[in-house]
Amino acid sequence: MRLGLLMFLPLLLLATRYRAVTALSYDPTWESLDRRPLPAWFDQAKFGIFIHWGVFSVPSFGSEWFWWYWQKERRPKFVDFMDNNYPPGFKYEDFGVLFTAKYFNANQWADLLQASGAKYVVLTSKHHEGFTLWGSAHSWNWNAVDEGPKRDIVKELEVAVRNRTDLHFGLYYSLFEWFHPLFLEDQSSAFQKQRFPVAKTLPELYELVTKYQPEVLWSDGDGGAPDHYWNSTDFLAWLYNESPVRDTVVTNDRWGAGSICKHGGYYTCSDRYNPGHLLPHKWENCMTIDKFSWGYRREAEIGDYLTIEELVKQLVETVSCGGNLLMNIGPTLDGIIPVIFEERLRQMGTWLKVNGEAIYETHTWRSQNDTVTPDVWYTSKPEKKLVYAIFLKWPISGKLFLGQPIGSLGETEVELLGHGRPLTWTSSKPSGIVVELPRLSVHQMPCKWGWTLALTNVT
């Protein structure tokens, strides 16, 4: 009897293991895939940096949609730019050799990303123009190894980010390409044919994941084709079940026409999405420092860039409503991050050094912003009995009126982050509290562009 049990034990363990594996596996259906819990690190991170870089950085005019606006829509602004600056017969493909990345230094980029306070980065491995920032075998002579830089940009940044920072490394990938012959052929068949995803999109997606192991896979650009044309659910089932990043990878919602804001890991819904209220599903506000372009554009004026005050406001509003902020920059054709982007990144890092406690690893509170003082937004850490009130304007009176928190005498404590001393507060009628802020000179302020009160034991 005992011998029989010993002989049966390996089979029992195998069966148990099989049940555990299958319990965590996902079928290639949205119903199954949408049940996958989002890896915890993403919600804890709160803040990431988006980098739009490609051949569009060579003309660096108008936006990263330069090729489309010039050749497809024939917008006068773009046609005139080419007529005035390039010889007749110049093609968009001719920009490829001019995309030199001459001064691209992945270590410098990584150090700047670390200084920004961001916890993840997403690089455009391929935008709608089809040029890949790695040596894709499926993008012959239209990739960064064969043309222009003659370097594997994706690999260099991946190594630098993982060796020099605590950021999670992510990749953006455009499913479609504006002018690829196979995509245009499929499009003309109302997407009954699938030559393009089979020959181009899917092989590149599998290669990106296996070769660079991104922890964010940011899909975009469905070209009007549904998810079944892209074979999205089969790919995501592999990503979640078998890929080398199956336990940590997060994905967005742009996997085919009709999937956005409906299916996927977290929702982006639209560019610059900031609903201003709590959502039932994890979401991300992907936005740009340059108000009018994701890629670098040399004709931008100073007023076209969001100020640090506006960026802090975006971050605070987004996190208070349960989202992550993905803030975009655009490097130049030779690999330099323009000074104005560098300044904004470093300013965000400076602000987060003081106020990061109220951002990273926080939860939403019962109220997202205050009813009495509108420029106050709330986050919380329930396990520490903490509520954070982030206020974007310092009141002239020196008193901050908060309509939402309810304090308890002898229990509630209030502290200004970066100041370190308890503050005096009183109850307010009909509800809320009034906090007496410290009298500080400009040089004594813990930060410049928004401040945080840590409230202990409030309801």
Swiss-Prot record:
Catalysis: reaction(s): an alpha-L-fucoside + H2O = L-fucose + an alcohol
The keyword Glycoprotein is assigned to this record: yes
Record's GO cellular component terms: extracellular space; lysosome
SMART domains given in the database record: Alpha_L_fucos (SM00812)
PROSITE patterns, sorted: ALPHA_L_FUCOSIDASE
Keyword terms: Glycoprotein, Glycosidase, Hydrolase, Phosphoprotein, Secreted, Signal
Glycosylation sites: N163, N231, N369
A single BP term in Gene Ontology: response to bacterium
A GO molecular-function descriptor: alpha-L-fucosidase activity
Stored Pfam families: Alpha_L_fucos, Fucosidase_C
Cellular compartments annotated: Secreted
This protein's record includes keyword Cell inner membrane: no
Signal peptide: 1-23
Residues annotated as site: May be important for catalysis: C286
Subunit structure: Homotetramer.
Family label: Belongs to the glycosyl hydrolase 29 family.
Database matches in PANTHER family: ALPHA-L-FUCOSIDASE, PLASMA ALPHA-L-FUCOSIDASE
Function as written in the Swiss-Prot or TrEMBL entry: Alpha-L-fucosidase is responsible for hydrolyzing the alpha-1,6-linked fucose joined to the reducing-end N-acetylglucosamine of the carbohydrate moieties of glycoproteins.
Identification of the protein by name: Plasma alpha-L-fucosidase
Organism of origin: Rattus norvegicus (Rat)
UniProt gene name: Fuca2
